[in-house]
Regions:
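Histidine/acidic residue-rich metal-binding segments in metalloenzymes
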Residues: 77-254
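Gly-rich Lys/Arg/Thr-decorated short loops/hinges at beta-loop-alpha junctions or inter-strand turns
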Residues: 1, 29-32, 58, 138-149
Length: 259
């Protein structure tokens, strides 16, 4: 809701429309994301979102905190203080130029979460592998929406999921792996749960409604862009694996991930 966006991009929801919709659907509390930008104080980030929201809310509202710049001040002062103020869930990214955290940064955020008894959500895709594959596709002129999926195949998600789980083991905290797209990442979550590792997982409608074949023939326009998400839709086998994970309880959360 009301996230920073690029030129000519307008979010479908502002705080007024989103919380009104929530109320109409019977939801009395919402927690959208407050996204820290590089170089920004986390406290300043949270205050700016509250400023946008104030006077435009129809239900109770707080925020999940997206940590993109875990500076010593953020980790040592701001994040612990905000956790004690009641902001008890964070989100971190293992990809995207403006959001990615390296392994040491992930571990440090996890450590704060453990100390403050908060929960961390993880977007698990391998940044360097995606950059490598994207550069190859761009050099070959393969730019259509279909190739987005080829730039971040299942192995990239599988590797990052396993790495996130391993980091959580090192620090000994529970984490949530969000928007799981296919059977390879799902296999890592099952592996962890079978060993008693404290892992939760989420998937979304796009992974049971779409496959990579739906991306074929799309153009470089807004209609094509509507199908682009990360992680991308996978093959039919993965679609079935996601259905099975929902049915057998491997997934703890099923949500729209709508942005």
């Amino acid at each position: 809701i009301d996230q920073p966006s690029g030129p000519d991009v307008e979010m479908a929801d502002n705080f007024q429309s989103a919380t009104r919709s929530a109320a109409a659907g019977g939801n009395t509390t919402v927690l959208p994301f407050a996204m820290q930008e590089k170089g920004q104080s986390l406290r300043e980030c949270v205050e700016s979102y509250h400023k946008k929201a104030n006077g435009n809310l129809f239900v109770d509202t707080s925020f999940h905190l997206i940590i993109s710049d875990p500076s010593p001040q953020v980790l040592g002062q701001e994040l612990p203080a905000l956790a004690r103020d009641g902001y008890t869930s964070f989100k971190v990214f293992m990809t995207y130029d403006d959001l990615v955290l390296n392994d040491e940064e992930l571990l440090k955020v996890f450590e704060v979460a453990k100390n403050e008894k908060t929960l961390v959500m993880v977007h698990a895709e391998g940044y360097d592998a995606i950059r490598f594959l994207t550069k190859k596709l761009e050099d070959e002129g393969k730019l259509a929406p279909y190739y987005h999926g080829l730039s971040r195949p299942q192995i990239v998600e599988r590797e990052a999921t396993h790495r996130a789980i391993s980091h959580a083991q090192i620090v000994d905290i529970p984490i949530v792996i969000v928007h799981v797209s296919g059977e390879e990442a799902l296999s890592q979550i099952k592996w962890a749960k079978e060993r008693g590792i404290k892992i939760f997982s989420e998937t979304c409608p796009q992974y049971i409604c779409l496959t990579e074949d739906d991306m074929k023939g799309l153009n470089m326009d807004f209609e094509g862009a509507k199908y682009v998400c990360s992680p991308p839709p996978r093959d039919l086998e993965s679609q079935q694996a996601i259905w099975d994970g929902l049915i057998d309880g491997t997934f703890d959360i099923f949500s729209s991930d709508h942005c």
